[in-house]
UniProtKB/Swiss-Prot annotation:
Mn(2+) binds at D19, H201, H203. Substrate binds at R18, D19, S172, H201, Y292. It is an enzyme of class 4 (lyase). Residues 10-262 form the Pyruvate carboxyltransferase domain. It catalyses: (S)-4-hydroxy-2-oxopentanoate = acetaldehyde + pyruvate. The record marks R18 as: Transition state stabilizer. The active site is at H22. GO terms for molecular function: 2-isopropylmalate synthase activity; 4-hydroxy-2-oxovalerate aldolase activity; manganese ion binding. Belongs to the 4-hydroxy-2-oxovalerate aldolase family. Its EC number is 4.1.3.39. PROSITE patterns: PYR_CT (PS50991). It comes from Rhizorhabdus wittichii (strain DSM 6014 / CCUG 31198 / JCM 15750 / NBRC 105917 / EY 4224 / RW1). It comes from the Bacteria. This is 4-hydroxy-2-oxovalerate aldolase 3.
Length: 341
C-alpha cells in the first residue's frame, strides 16, 4: 500500500481504555475513563477504544470481572467526546452481534473484530453486521507472530473479503522484531486491495513497541495503536506519547498535541498502575517466549497461589503455544509444576 506519512495523515488509535484494562485487572472507575478520554479527545487523537480488556462482554470468571460493565464505561466516555471516534473491540464468541448493535446505539462508530491469527473465518458474521450498521470496521489478527507472513496475509484477505476497511498486524505477545513486522506488512501488500488500510498493534515486551510501529508505517501502515504511558497488557503497548514524539521528529503528520499526551500519561494514567507497566523479568519473558500479553496477571496470581516462579509458568505457556481464551490452563500448568517437584 502506498502511504506517505509526511504528506498523508496517520490514524492514531488510543487503546488505554481497552488494552489498558488488562494492566489494572479491568478496574477503571468511571471518573478515570472520563478524565482520560477527555484528555485524549483534547489532544486530538483520532479514535479511542473502550471495553473490557477482552472486548465486549469479556467480564467473566475466565478473563476477570470488570469494576463496571462495558456499557457503563462506553456511556461515560460518550458523554465527553467532541473530536475522537468512539471505538470498541469484539471477539466473536465472547461478544455477539446483539452487543455490537447495542454499542452502536450508545454512540460507538468504529469496531475492531478480533480473532486468533488462524481463525479469521469466525469474524465473517460480525464484520458483515458492523458494515450493515454503517460502522468503520477493522479486522484484528491476534498473536500474528505465530504464523508466517504469507499465511497471515491469507487470513487478512479473508477479513477484507468480509468487508473490513482495515486489517491489523497484531503482535499480542510483543514477540516480533522489526524485520518480522516489515515482512508481514509486505505480505499484506501482496494480497490486499490498495484501498484496504493496514494497522499496527504492538506490545513493548521486548522494548520494540515504538520501533515496530515506526517500521510498520514505513511499510504502508496507516492506523497505529498506542496507549498513554504504554498502559496495556504485559509491558504495555507502544507508549502513545513516545510514538508521537518519534513521529514528530520524523516529520510525520499525526495531528496530535504531544505535550497534552505527555501530561495525560504522567498525571492521569501512571498513578493508576497497581503494578508498573514496564519491561521486567516477567514481562520480558512474555516477549521472549511469545506469550499472549494479557496472561501476565493471571500467571502472577497462579505464582502467588501455588509458589511457582511466574517466568516458569509463562515459559511453559509459550512452549504449549497457548492462545487467548486458555487462561484457565495457567492454573493447570502451575499445579503440574507443583506436582513435579
Amino acid at each position: 500500500m502506498s502511504f506517505d506519512p509526511n504528506m498523508q495523515k496517520l490514524y492514531i488509535q488510543d487503546v488505554t481504555l481497552r488494552d489498558g484494562m488488562h494492566a489494572i485487572r479491568h478496574q477503571y472507575g468511571l471518573d478515570h475513563v472520563q478524565a482520560i478520554a477527555r484528555a485524549l479527545d483534547r489532544a486530538k487523537v483520532d479514535a479511542i477504544e473502550v471495553a473490557h480488556g477482552d472486548g465486549l462482554q469479556g467480564s467473566s470468571f475466565n478473563y476477570g470481572f470488570g469494576a463496571y460493565t462495558d456499557w457503563d464505561w462506553i456511556g461515560a466516555v460518550a458523554e465527553v467526546l467532541e473530536h475522537s471516534v468512539l471505538t470498541t473491540l469484539l471477539l466473536p464468541g465472547i461478544g455477539t452481534v446483539h452487543d455490537l448493535k447495542h454499542a452502536y446505539e450508545m454512540g460507538v462508530r468504529s469496531v475492531r473484530i478480533a480473532t486468533h491469527c488462524t481463525e479469521a473465518d469466525v469474524s465473517k458474521q460480525h464484520i458483515e453486521a458492523a458494515r450493515n450498521l454503517g460502522m468503520d470496521v477493522s479486522g484484528f489478527l491476534m498473536m500474528s507472530h505465530m504464523i508466517d507472513p504469507e499465511a497471515l496475509a491469507e487470513q487478512a484477505l479473508l477479513m477484507e473479503s468480509y468487508g473490513a476497511h482495515c486489517v491489523y498486524v497484531t503482535d499480542s505477545g510483543g514477540a516480533m522484531n522489526m524485520d518480522e513486522y516489515a515482512a508481514r506488512c509486505q505480505a499484506y501488500d501482496r494480497v490486499l486491495k490498495p484501498e484496504t488500510q493496514r494497522g499496527v498493534h504492538a506490545h513493548h515486551n521486548l522494548s520494540l513497541g515504538v520501533a515496530n510501529s515506526i517500521v510498520a508505517v514505513q511499510n504502508g501502515v496507516v492506523r497505529v495503536d498506542a496507549s498513554l504511558a504504554g498502559m496495556g497488557a504485559g509491558a504495555g503497548n507502544a507508549p502513545l506519547e513516545v510514538f508521537i514524539a518519534a513521529a514528530d521528529r520524523m516529520g510525520w503528520n499525526h495531528g496530535c498535541d504531544l505535550f497534552a499526551l505527555m501530561d495525560a500519561a504522567e498525571d492521569l494514567v501512571r498513578p493508576l498502575q497497581d503494578r508498573p507497566v514496564r519491561v521486567d523479568r516477567e514481562t520480558l519473558t512474555l516477549g521472549y517466549a511469545g506469550v499472549y500479553s494479557s496472561f501476565l496477571r493471571h500467571a502472577e496470581k497462579a505464582s502467588s497461589d501455588y509458589g511457582v516462579d511466574t517466568r516458569s509458568i509463562l515459559a511453559e505457556v509459550g512452549r504449549r503455544k497457548m492462545v487467548g481464551g486458555q487462561e484457565d490452563m495457567i492454573v493447570d500448568i502451575a499445579l503440574d509444576m507443583v506436582k513435579a517437584r
